[in-house]
Amino acid sequence: MKTKIIVIVGPTAVGKTALSIEVAKAFNGQIISGDSQQVYRGLNIGTAKIRPEEQEGISHYLLDVRDVGESYSAYDFVTEATQAIREIEAQGQLPIICGGTGLYIQSLLEGYHLGGSVPHEEILAYRAQLDSWSDEDLFGKIAELGIEIPQINRRRAMRALEIAHLGGQLENNLPDYEALLICLDDKREKLYERINQRVDLMIEDGLLEEARWLFDKAPTSQASKGIGYKELFPYFAGQVSLEEAVDKLKQNTRRFAKRQLTWFRNRMSVTFYQVGNPDYKNQVMEDIKNFLDK
């Protein structure tokens, strides 16, 4: 029997973390972070990492598991999240994945992962190329390569071509998990307003000092390429004013939120919940209960 898991995704600043705590408390769960930046020790403010006092006694996995000079990939995430799910299940508790890194979460849920040597950026670039192909082009390439796919559709065809092109291995044809995918959303103007406010609060909370530490310690690392840090590096180098850097950070975060929503909408079978709906949490809880009772 497949392991049932809850997955909470959505754009940055929409309220995923707070909801994950409520779900964990209501359904005896533990939380696995699905965020590519929160794995890094020392990057707390810019990644909006949940603080220990906010965890309310709920165990969290895949936070602070790498130093900032180290790399982290979808391969690493799938390997470590799989182990975390096993540990949580062995304790008789519910695994809850919460985060906004669609590539990582999708790789876990679809039952395969690409080889650990494939850079994140290369995967994204090839996926963008496949996105531009018509169904006819995709299925034609599948036939040309002699790839056999049960119940072929566009999504499966794209996965198979990614694996063939990037040299990964299909570990499972079917996923190991039965997942309920919850995607939080909000009206654009509300979400963007929260993003701008969050950035201002991050600056007040010490983001400049945190980013400066990263700039001095590992300026060319994978960690330094994350939104929240790279925008401030030109300020440290004396190339732009602080106001310009912060404006760029807000702009990049808004654009990132838009890309996240596009990913979840087009690549994952999620159910959307509007956080502006005063009853949305009750609906989430009811849907989780029904899912677990099946």
UniProtKB/Swiss-Prot annotation:
Enumerate the Gene Ontology biological process terms: tRNA modification
| Pfam families associated with the record | IPPT
Q: What is its EC number?
A: 2.5.1.75
- Could you tell me what reaction this enzyme catalyses? adenosine(37) in tRNA + dimethylallyl diphosphate = N(6)-dimethylallyladenosine(37) in tRNA + diphosphate
Q: Which residues bind substrate?
A: 12-17
Q: Which UniProt keywords apply?
A: ATP-binding, Magnesium, Nucleotide-binding, Transferase, tRNA processing
Gene3D superfamilies found in the cross-reference section: P-loop containing nucleotide triphosphate hydrolases (3.40.50.300)
Sites where the protein binds ATP: 10-17
Listed GO MF terms: ATP binding; tRNA dimethylallyltransferase activity
Q: Where is this site: Interaction with substrate tRNA?
A: 101, 127
For region Interaction with substrate tRNA, the annotated ranges are 35-38
Listed HAMAP family: IPP_trans
Tell me the function of this protein: Catalyzes the transfer of a dimethylallyl group onto the adenine at position 37 in tRNAs that read codons beginning with uridine, leading to the formation of N6-(dimethylallyl)adenosine (i(6)A).
Quaternary state and interactors: Monomer.
What the record says about family reads: Belongs to the IPP transferase family.
Protein name as catalogued: tRNA dimethylallyltransferase
Q: Which gene encodes it?
A: miaA
